[in-house]
């Protein structure tokens, strides 16, 4: 069931009963990327899957990346209703979750950061600048195949044509200006100086084949956080919860149960 939170600015699907668990989607995908794992998680948690600001029915934020993190903190505070919350972010959603937790230390008791990081390498920053420029000049169709390659390995794409058709359509529904702004923010973002102050337990996951946020980014993130553990998912790329849902659920299960 969809509900509006944060004074009507954030739309989210809500299902299940139990402690609140929030799932933040990536930039190159949408909240449907969690469809394969949400039903299982809803057996133990109240699962809240928002559309990030500027996606779907959620209102865009014009003030930059920190303001997006603040908006999502409003969502978590509103939807959790005072209960201890766990936040899981994939890709861009992981960066948002990390920035949110750094700016609002009491907002979550645990974080799962899947295929994210604290800062991109210079080649990674250049890739975002190039995608933003291409999207501005020729529209999202010009970079759709680049986006899909960043999400899934070619072998996976070849084996799942129907899924890939759905993922391309989802990407093309993204607001181009929201996409360009997010690319610009990620090209400049560097959260590393703040990581030492984040005390909550963090599970850092990454697909071994992830080209969008390669494993060295997750290794660096886990090493710089005071209370983090790292898991590398074999055979997975940037959206492991969609590519290998059972593997992903097994990887996060113990960490979630510890809460």
Q: Model-flagged regions — what are they?
A:
Residues 98-103, 107-138:
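Flexible "cap/lid" loop of the alpha/beta hydrolase fold
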Residues 89, 93, 97:
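Gly/Ala-rich beta-loop-alpha elbow adjacent to hydrolase catalytic centers
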């Amino acid at each position: 069931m969809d509900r509006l939170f944060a004074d009507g600015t954030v739309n989210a699907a809500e299902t299940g009963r139990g402690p609140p668990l929030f799932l933040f989607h990536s930039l190159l995908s949408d909240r449907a990327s969690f469809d394969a794992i949400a039903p299982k998680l809803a057996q133990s948690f109240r699962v809240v899957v928002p559309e990030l600001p500027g996606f779907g029915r959620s209102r865009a934020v014009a003030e930059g990346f920190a303001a997006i993190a603040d908006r999502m903190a409003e969502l978590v505070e509103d939807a959790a209703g005072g209960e201890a919350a766990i936040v899981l972010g994939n890709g861009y959603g992981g960066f948002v979750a990390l920035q949110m937790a750094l700016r609002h230390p009491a907002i979550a008791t645990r974080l799962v950061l899947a295929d994210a990081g604290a800062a991109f390498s210079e080649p990674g920053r250049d890739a975002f600048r190039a995608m933003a420029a291409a999207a501005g000049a020729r529209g999202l169709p010009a970079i759709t195949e680049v986006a899909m390659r960043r999400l899934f390995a070619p072998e996976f794409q070849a084996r799942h044509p129907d899924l890939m058709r759905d993922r391309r359509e989802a990407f093309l529904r993204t607001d181009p200006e929201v996409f360009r702004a997010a690319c610009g923010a990620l090209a400049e973002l560097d959260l590393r100086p703040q990581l030492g102050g984040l005390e909550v337990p963090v599970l850092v996951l990454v697909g071994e084949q992830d080209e969008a946020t390669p494993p060295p980014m997750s290794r660096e993130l886990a090493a710089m956080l005071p209370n983090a553990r790292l898991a590398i998912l074999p055979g997975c790329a940037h959206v492991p919860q969609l590519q290998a849902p059972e593997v992903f659920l097994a990887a996060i299960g113990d960490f979630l149960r510890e809460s």
